[in-house]
Amino acid sequence: EFIVAPVMNPALGEYCAGVGVPWIPGCGTVSEVFFAQELGAELVKIYPANLLTPAFIAAVHAVMPTISLIPTGGVEPTLESIKPWFDAGALCVGMGSQLFRKEDIAAGDYLKIQQKIKEVMTFIASLRNPSHS
């Protein structure tokens, strides 16, 4: 059990800490990441990633090297989009509407979605273990 939040809400962080539930707040500034970590977050969602850059992760890790970061919001299911985030130190990436396209869902084209997921997982595996790519 865990909670993912779209924003860094201190009251939610305090509540989660009090009941022992991990939370993953959404942060868009270094200050928000700092406050989230102060409130017990070990994992932070960088949102919206498409308005930030992988350099943001490197900057955060320069002052908070132990925090794990997940860019979400605008990360595309392509190697060109994913690789810079991993190169900067992202733990993983979050994808929603970029991976599960409305038109594919509306058409019932679940095979296309499944193939895209496999492709993305292959990209990630190659980034995590370059000797096997």
Predicted regions mapped to residue ranges:
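C-terminal helical cap(s) of enzyme catalytic domains, especially alpha/beta-barrels
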Residues: C16-G18, F86, K102-H132
